[in-house]
């Protein structure tokens, strides 16, 4: 890993905040409580790299508008960015959230946070009620039935977006190469991690094509994880991160 990324201000502050976040979770609920099981703070490494690749500053991207965290889980990054001075709007869907959004509310109360928390259904006709300078849309796209509609709608209300999702270079049986074409694989209900909320896994060119067709310009892109990736297996898990700018100009209502 590039030491300039590893020791960047964003990453260093994030790792310190992670320690505080984990302590708060221990005090906020019993040990049996079902917290989001993944480390959201590892996303700061690719986000910082994308930012550097594009030559942009976070404050420049956010501007004077709020930062939107779509798929906030327990609010790890929402509360972190609030600690950096950003006004944050954190959204998730209680119907699919592991603890029905109790976790994010418990942490908010413990922190005395002013983060605006909203329970939304992205596939249920969600329409942003305000404009955003920067959106975080991480690890959520493949949980959507209609990612095109959501990403297109977001491009009308946010100027910049950090997007990440699972991608695949090969079909599950590795007989069809997906990575050379803009394509998407539709998962069976039990095909990926036994999670019925997983739907579309794009090829890397497919994700770029989707973003462009939805009204975004791709400013920077990187991929992490498996090299011979597929849509279904743990060993074949690859993620693509994009830094996007709306091609529609300033967000409109």
Put a short name on every predicted segment:
Residues 1-131, 178-179, 222-224, 231-253:
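Conserved N-terminal segment of class I S-adenosyl-L-methionine
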Residues 46-48, 143, 200:
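A conditional alpha-helix N-cap/helix-loop micro-motif detector
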Residues 125, 132, 136-137, 145-252:
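S-adenosyl-L-methionine-dependent methyltransferase catalytic module, highlighting the catalytic core
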Residues 140:
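Hydrophobic adenine-recognition pocket in adenosine-nucleotide-binding enzymes
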């Amino acid at each position: 890993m590039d030491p300039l990324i590893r020791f960047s201000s964003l990453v260093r502050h994030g790792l310190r905040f992670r320690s505080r976040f984990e302590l708060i979770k221990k005090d906020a609920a019993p040990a049996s409580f079902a917290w989001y099981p993944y480390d959201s703070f590892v996303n700061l490494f690719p986000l910082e790299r994308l930012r550097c690749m594009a030559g942009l500053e976070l404050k420049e991207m956010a501007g004077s508008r709020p930062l939107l965290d779509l798929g906030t889980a327990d609010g790890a990054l929402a509360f972190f960015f609030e600690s950096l001075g950003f006004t944050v709007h954190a959204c998730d869907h209680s119907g699919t959230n592991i603890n029905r959004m109790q976790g994010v509310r418990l942490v908010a109360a413990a922190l005395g946070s002013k983060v605006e928390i909203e329970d939304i259904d992205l596939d249920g006709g969600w329409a942003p009620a305000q404009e955003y300078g920067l959106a975080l849309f991480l690890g959520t796209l493949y949980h959507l039935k209609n990612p095109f509609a959501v990403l297109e709608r977001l491009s009308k209300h946010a100027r910049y977006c950090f997007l990440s999702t699972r991608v695949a270079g090969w079909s599950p049986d590795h007989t069809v190469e997906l990575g050379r074409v803009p394509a998407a694989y539709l998962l069976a209900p039990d095909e990926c991690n036994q999670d019925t909320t997983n739907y579309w896994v794009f090829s890397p060119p497919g994700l770029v094509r989707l973003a462009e067709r939805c009204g975004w310009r791709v400013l920077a892109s990187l991929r992490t994880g498996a090299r011979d990736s597929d849509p279904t297996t743990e060993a074949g898990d690859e993620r693509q991160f994009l830094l996007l700018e709306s091609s529609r100009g300033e967000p409109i209502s």
